[in-house]
Amino acid sequence: MPRPFRFGVNLVEPAPAAEWRAKCRRAEELGYDVLLAPDHLGSVAPFPALVAAAEATSRPRVGTFVLNAGFWNPALLAREVATADALTGGRLELGLGTGYVQQEHEQAGLPWGSPGERVDHLRRTVEELDRLLGSPEHRPQAVQRPRVPLLIGANGDRMLRLTARHADIAAFTAARSVPGSATGLVPLGAEELDERVALYRELAADRAEPAELNLLLQIVAVTDDPAAVLEPLLEHVPGLTLEQASALPAVLVGTREQLVARVRALRERFGFSYLTVLEPSMEAFAEVMAGLRGA
């Protein structure tokens, strides 16, 4: 039996208190299972935003998607995680990554290490969080045991190894970092993503419990005119054709029926049962979710 679908929305736009609560309630009404906050300069501070999201809603879980480990001291992060889990009634999911925007580190006056150094820092952070939050002497205490569910966003070999060892949720962006590109990331095609997921499964083969697999959908649009929606992407990725863009795993553009079929195919081919969309796609993807409930 395939794992049931879960759907999350990453609420990337800051908002005043009443507007923030209203959009969290709207996401709950639309059927989202997880309300998420990013960790970028210019976005909301994740933990207070998630506590407010939990207070405004009753059903969805809340989570970071994903924290930049380079912004955080592990001991201070453990305090934030435990407090947020307690204040949300045990609804928190912790998403971690290495960060990929050098300019944000420079703005914050924080060192920007090599890729290997950033992975090492993330590994130390995960291990220290497990030690601190697993200790009965740690104050404050999280609600969830043995720990708050951990999501790690990964693509490279070392990150996939770390994810296989530690994460309850393995998150794939279906993109890779490329210095000098317009966004810092370029999308992965289906064959490249096949290889990344296959490597993760190999590295995770000895796990007692299989992890949930997550995919971040970068573009979602219910439309009869895919070319109009995808034109900006074609401008950002030289050499990418409309046909290739339409087939990218992280791009869902087409009619509602086509997108429902695409989401089912993502789970069948790659194992992605937990799908996350960005806030601008929240309403559009809700149309697709309606065709997948109970699947």
PLM features: residue spans?
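Active-site-adjacent structural elements that line small-molecule/cofactor binding pockets in enzymes
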Residues: 1-295
